């Protein structure tokens, strides 16, 4: 009696979500003539004004004003209100990006889906969306 072993090779699964996001981001950067810096995590950013040395850390509380939109220009948050929150409560792309600027600083973040909401859809944000934020860090403080 012979034993037969079946092997299924699933080498060709297509591009990963990370690869798809990076292709979309690179096309967006090229189309909009942007000069971004890319971190190891895949976050792209432009610092317009680093400002002072009071940079937030993971546990800092921040007050920020921002506009958030998708790569196709769909605005999901118009920045009409200030955000007052502990940085640790934000998406990973914000946590990483905002630590690069100080109080009063301004930047652009282009966040791949794994550093945003991933496979979770939000009100105006489809699942696996690359997010773009124009941010101004108004204040950094520690809540006591």
Q: What role is predicted for each listed range?
A:
Residues 1-7:
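Bacterial N-terminal signal peptides
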Residues 7-144:
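Cross-family detector of peptidyl-prolyl cis-trans isomerase
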């Amino acid at each position: 009696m012979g034993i037969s072993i079946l092997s299924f090779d699933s080498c060709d699964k297509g591009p990963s979500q990370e690869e798809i996001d990076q292709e979309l981001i690179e096309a967006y950067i090229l189309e909009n003539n942007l000069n971004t810096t890319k971190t190891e995590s895949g976050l792209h950013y432009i610092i317009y004004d680093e400002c002072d040395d009071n940079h937030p850390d993971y546990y800092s509380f921040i007050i920020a004003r921002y506009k958030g939109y998708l790569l196709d220009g769909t605005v999901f948050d118009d920045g009409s209100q200030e955000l007052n929150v502990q940085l640790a409560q934000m998406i990973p792309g914000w946590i990483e990006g905002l630590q690069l600027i100080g109080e009063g600083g301004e930047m652009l973040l282009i966040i791949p889906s794994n550093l945003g909401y991933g496979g979770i859809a939000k009100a105006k944000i489809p699942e696996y969306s690359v997010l773009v934020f124009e941010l101004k860090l108004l204040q950094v403080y520690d809540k006591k």
